[in-house]
Amino acid sequence: MKDYIYQNTLINKKQLKELLAWSFSKYDSMQASLLADELKYLGFKYATQAGISISIEDLKVPATKNEMLEKANKDILNAEKICLKGKITDVERFQKIIDTWSIASESLKDNVVSYFKTYDPLNSVYIMAFSGARGNLSQVRQLVGMRGLMADPSGEIMRVPIKKNFREGLTITDYLMSGYGARKGIVDTALKTANSGYLTRRLIDIAQDIVIREKDCLTSSSFLIDSQTKFDTEQLIGRVLLKSVYDSKTEKLIAKANTQLTLDLLNLFNQKQISKFYIRSPLTCNLYHSICQMCYGWDLSNQNLVDLGEAVGILAGQSIGEPGTQLTMRTFHTGGIFTSEARQQIISPKNGIIKFSKILKTIILRTNRGEDVLLTKNSGSLILIPEKHTDEIIQIELLRNTMLFVKSNQYIKQSAIIGELISTDKQTLTERKPILSDTAGEIFIPRLKTRMNLITQNRLLWILSGQVYQAPSNSFLNFYTDHKINKNSYIFRTKLINQYSGYTKVLNQNKNLLEQKIQITNETYFLENSYVQKILKPITNKNYLLNFNNLTYLITLKDSNSKNWKRCKKYKPFATSFNNNFKTLTGGIMYYDQRIKQKFDSFNTLISYNIAYEISKEDYDKVSKDHYENYLKKLENKIDKNGFIFYQNFLNYQEMESIFLKFKLKKKIVHNSLIWLSEETYKLNCDKNILLVENGNFIAKNFEIIPNIISKTAGIITVSQKNNMIEEIAIKAGFVYQGKQFEQLDKKVYYPGEIIFDNIKITQPSLCEHINNKSNNQLLIRPFAIYEIPKEKTVKSLFSDKNNSKSIFTITNKITYLYKTNQKIKTSNHINLISQNINLKAKNSVQNNTIIDLSNSFKTKRLNLRISENLLLKHYIPAHLKYTNLQYCLLVEPTQFIDSYTTLGYLESLITNSLEIVKFKSKRANKKQVFLISNKDCITVRKEQGKNKTANELIIDNINVNQTGKVLIDNGQFLTVQKGRPYFFPNCKSDDSKEKLDLQYKLIGLNNTISNNTNTFLNYYDVTKRSLVERLGPNKKSYGFKVKFSKMFIKKNGKFYSSPIPLFLNNFSIIKEEQKRLNEGKNEINNFIIKNTQLKIKQCLPLLLKSSELVTNKIKRKTPFNNNLTGLKFLKYPFNKSIGIHSLTEDYFEQEVNNVYCKNGEFIEKGEVIGLLNFEKEITGDIVQGLPRIEELLEARKKKPTNKHLATNQKKSLLIQKTSIDSSFEFQKLGTTIKENDKINPHNLLKIYFNYYGIKKQFFSNKEMFALSYRLTDNYEASYRTFKKIQLLILNAVQSVYESQGVSIANKHLEVIIKQMTTKVLITHEGHTPLLPREVVDLYHIQYINKIIEAHNKRPAYYVPLLLGITKAALNNPSFISAASFQETTRVLTKAAIEGRVDWLRGLKENIIIGHLIPSGTGYQSYSNCFNQLAQSKTKINLEKIKIKI
């Protein structure tokens, strides 16, 4: 054994490890194993010579335990009191309890250890605990300290600890609580092994084809190892240097490139103080689907360079998966004890005064235990000046992020806590906890003095106790203040009142309150001279005829529950007039003044002034005449093709308002005439050959057009056909004259008595139509009918009473047009143009509650009516009162006759026990409530005790917490205090921050970047944009270019989004001008300035935005604020992928705020939610968090970020916006992520980096103000660099999980796997390549394709990097046999078959499945040779071809 220094010390577990490692690296594995054997025999030899015994007496419980428990209990009581006083929230109290217990249990453990160390170093328990063999400290702590806090089944902490230990014995509750953890350990072991096995399978599947195939890939990229970054020497040994290392002083060569790093070499670097060197890694290797020897480095099992043909992928998969199976066993041993690292505390050694150094910067912060502390923003120091002058001044160094519980110049006692470090690596879970009210009561929010400029405010609200009673609708109160109220007396009453007289009847009496109803029936009404008759065949589902004063109406009736009565179904329309006055023979076109309808549908116009209003004469002169005449001319042009002009809303709205908005308007009389042009239409579907007439023929009445179809009118036929099939035949009724010179008669109207061409007499109003055929000119004279439509009027006396009292229904005649004006009704049957209905409207009653039954009475020739009114109780009970204790009492008997407007009964809300009222308040908002403060809710206090407070002030009693509340009455000696309890909500959203500006945005032209004085540059380059225009001439060299859009940044609810802006449509601006008149304070909108830029695009998504700057300054706004509206249209069609709204700020920037859900003065019931609090829970750091976390990282899950409460109030933005120098001089550049890597969504980070690398940077040259903009990197470079960043992120995240579990895995294994996850890109624009958009290809592949394409001056493809999880990556394996044998077999195989893919059998799995020798290890030689043979044979073939040519 050469150069081994003899160690004459105690050798424990750690030294043993070092000894064996030394012998392994110095000699070899044989020697090391022999040494291990020898050590084993040595150990056994001495173990048999001296024994160790353990008895129950060795378990000594430290004497200080009781003191500590008492102190902890006292702290907890204190916390409860503070909480009741409203200084801390419920959640903070919980946190405080847990902290108190974990500190107590930790310090108890330290006591145990120090006790053993000083008094009993050979105690067998102590020896076992520190031997490093099996037992550990946490078990000793359970034996002789206290078991401490336990975790419940979901991994959260229970707030009651187990105070006993195993030496003292557990109580029954303790025992039950212990059961949770133990069970969890067993279950985990059973279930989690499967998980870890599956993880291994996926890892091996993704990396199975990675084999060492080359000696050197000649890469130029590498990792820079920096001495400032705390690197692990373990991870560096066995790597290979990329660049040579020189001595910084003498500039001599220390290590050449491609040297393997050994421990000696690293030590040499340390001596020479070489801080930076470059190493290779599997991530930097250039080979495709394999790795070269140099990049991989040592094979760790024999400390030599890895062999060619070694299957490193499978090694990597196994090395990562195997610890998973071990990790599952972790919880089993400790039995589910909750272990949280105790915080490192700074404890004052002496009494003295604290002073901070000048450079120490602090901010005020509220911790999750509700303490206000100072947090150091940079590292610095503080000094403690002791009381005694003889003692020395003590200086304490502070790190960054230390919490200080003291302020500067504060006096502090010995062993008080000065500060503590914030630990960052705890595993926590942020939750929201609803805070419920303990008692019913009234909410009172006192105003706190706060600084107004904070985004969040602290809220304090009191709940002052009392009883809340809800009232039914329309109720009245039933008592006065100072009353005593007996049990079961009522507070509210609602009267139930009927509308009509009649007989009463109560239905559903024994069911619950909501279903009960009271019915009042009256049979005294009738219709004279009328009867009802059943129609055998219902016409349009109307099944009865109502004969009334010799008029017939159609009516719908159904059978009612009694024999002779029929029940009406509808009241609107009640009956439809049955006459043929408006019935036409055939179809046609009808015209009427559309404004008649518009009385009813006026909401369909933008401003409901239409041309139905005339302008008064004097206003007419104001408008320039020509303007008005133009406008009338425009109207004249809008003449229907049949020669009628009808007032439609022809005018577009701008012209209208320009004329009409400025004038007083007069109503113009509208005539209800209707013009009818008949045109008979047959819809057919038949062959051309059956037709018996031709297009343009004139036929007589009753003429057969096609077999079995006979015309009803005479006229000209028009036939429309499609594909030799006749679709439609129309007959325009009228008389036809042959001749010439008919043009001037076209579209003219003639009236009876006029004569055309001296020989044609007109007998009825007609329209002339000129028909020009190839053969001849024809003049068609079409007669039209004019119908006059009666005005609607109210029928007064339709229903009469026996006593002739006033009727109970309002009856209206309603006329409805069944067709639109100008609409062609294509039919040959009879149609009704209008329908005349009678509508009934019951006076002063809810419509649905009245039911009408009819019955014929032939003796008296009248129709009897029976009117029933239903009073449903549920109409009087609002929805929120459905399940409260409402009662009701009836004052009427069944079948009693009552007059109208009688009180039938009451709905009441009862009181459960008798009270003496001190005070009451009632509210009449949307919910009616009464709040009673009775003696039970009050306490009386002597005035001296109440610190001389007067009425309406709040009292907090420090000693007796129950005596807290608001003073109601002060009578000089005693105070009556209404009990109350404060609740505290820190960091609530202040109302100011919810500005009403919902969506703000800023538009940016194409080339300007926007800069505010804040350090945010919003410059966002989106790579997924597709190019729009590709019309290029045949001889032009074509290059890919992208469409540029102006950018738009949108801010909504404090989040920023960016969107490449599509087409602008309109820019409205509504300018408010304030009137100078005093009497009208209203702002009138005076004018609309509307600029129109019409773009006719079909597929658009219109959007109206209110313009504003992104950041408004309330103080500086002196300019009048214009409400600019911008109408945007988003193109729907080609852009749904790329043009949209992208979020710029992720949710990391969101602050967590607590919410309060109630307003001042509200009454709430017991158990209602007052607000929500956010809080962090620590969860036990065992395997349950380990394996799933690793799986989540390797599967690259897109999880929503769950925010951790960082120490400061505002979340640190995880991507620091510009390069900024931190006050503790840590230099951070854009895009460096801060430690929170477990909360980062890797996909988003990928996007952010990629966009960053694609930014156009501007380079300025100052003399001529010459600016040049240049993109940072090209597409390949950007993707490559982005991938590198993400690879490191995932690597560090996975390693941190394994390290937290105490498992060490060599980085290179993880690197192999991660390399496989980050090779693919997604094509966004294909250019001239044969690829498709959204296709997934390898990065090196697309680079190769683009190289060739650019060499030919064609357009390259554009792409974005894609991160695949291990399952996805395994399915995207280039070999379809490997992918199909992994998962989703049929899908993978069908896809491969359709694409016609070829499997080159490169990996191990494919070859095993086919049955070949695997291409690694011994099979590697034959595998690499087969490629060489191929190449040789190819060249031979080429030679032969050349020979033939010669």
From Swiss-Prot:
SUPFAM superfamilies (UniProt xref): beta and beta-prime subunits of DNA dependent RNA-polymerase
CDD domains: RNAP_beta'_C
The protein's required cofactors: Zn(2+)
Major location category of this protein: plastid
EC number: 2.7.7.6
One GO process term, biological-process aspect: DNA-templated transcription
Compartments reported by the entry: Plastid, Chloroplast
Chain sites annotated for binding Zn(2+): 217, 285, 292, 295
Stated family: Belongs to the RNA polymerase beta' chain family. RpoC2 subfamily.
Function: DNA-dependent RNA polymerase catalyzes the transcription of DNA into RNA using the four ribonucleoside triphosphates as substrates.
Record protein name field: DNA-directed RNA polymerase subunit beta''
Lineage: Eukaryota, Sar, Stramenopiles, Ochrophyta, Bacillariophyta
Name of the coding gene: rpoC2
